[in-house]
């Protein structure tokens, strides 16, 4: 359960020297950064930058070629009942298409040792009606699947959320809802690592920004630090950094 993070708390996530290659091709190269408790950290980069690979390594779905990731003090896979401490949404389309939305949540609640009514509470929290909860997840729109995925991430009342593009498919009202939810989660002491292409929303909600390009960290700092003197805000910073990275690759 989120609560105020004590001063001097260790990082919620610590990534150190992370590298991953596929078939000899580097996808992530010597990536290091931390996610501090009680904050929203934005993880930004163009398509193919290595964001999703890094997130999959964090939660034990992909093995790194080198380096390590500590989630709440150790490997994610070593956490007992990890859903009670870390909420994860990497791919909203990965939900069982043949099960009703409520059933997806109720089964996970059972695995976590939570009462079945928790499924109903989470459906309400993310704005899915009881009737929508009885529909098969395969019949959901992308926006509804995203809401179900966020409900699943919140199911165990975790202290940390790891979310990959959770706003995909949400309409403007849904994006505003998600931004408010994440900001309130962090303000209550929770921690969020958020990957998103929605730069304006990221600028509005993130406390800290990590920009990745070509599998390497291009920038890492507080939002205030990185945007100081940048008239065009996060969009200008992002385009400037990624354009410079592209030029460096061409020159190399």
Predicted regions mapped to residue ranges:
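Catalytic Walker B motif of ABC-type/P-loop ATPase nucleotide-binding domains
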Residues: 161-165
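Helix-to-loop junction immediately C-terminal to a conserved catalytic motif
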Residues: 59
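Conserved ABC ATPase "signature" region
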Residues: 106, 110, 116-132
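ABC ATPase "signature
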Residues: 220-221
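Conserved ABC transporter NBD signature motif
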Residues: 67-82
């Amino acid at each position: 359960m989120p609560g105020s993070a004590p001063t001097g708390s260790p990082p919620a996530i610590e990534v150190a020297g992370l590298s991953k290659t596929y078939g000899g091709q580097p996808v992530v190269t010597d990536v290091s950064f931390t996610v501090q408790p009680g904050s929203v950290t934005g993880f930004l980069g163009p398509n193919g930058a290595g964001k999703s690979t890094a997130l999959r390594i964090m939660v034990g779905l992909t093995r790194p070629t080198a380096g390590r990731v500590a989630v709440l003090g150790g490997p994610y896979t070593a956490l007992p009942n990890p859903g009670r401490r870390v909420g994860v949404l990497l791919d909203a389309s990965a939900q069982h298409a043949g099960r009703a939305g409520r059933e997806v949540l109720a089964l996970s609640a059972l695995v976590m040792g939570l009462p079945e009514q928790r499924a109903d509470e989470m459906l309400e929290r993310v704005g899915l009606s009881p009737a929508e909860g009885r529909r098969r997840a395969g019949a959901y729109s992308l926006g509804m699947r995203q809401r179900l995925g966020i409900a699943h991430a919140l199911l165990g009342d975790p202290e940390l959320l790891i979310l990959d593009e959770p706003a995909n498919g949400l309409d403007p009202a849904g994006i505003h809802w998600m931004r408010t939810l994440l900001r309130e989660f962090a303000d209550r002491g929770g921690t969020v690592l958020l990957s998103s292409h929605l730069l304006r929303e990221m600028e509005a909600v993130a406390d800290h920004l990590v920009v990745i390009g070509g599998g390497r960290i291009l920038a890492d700092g507080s939002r205030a630090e990185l945007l100081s003197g940048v008239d065009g805000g996060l969009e200008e910073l992002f385009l400037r950094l990624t354009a410079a990275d592209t030029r460096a690759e061409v020159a190399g």
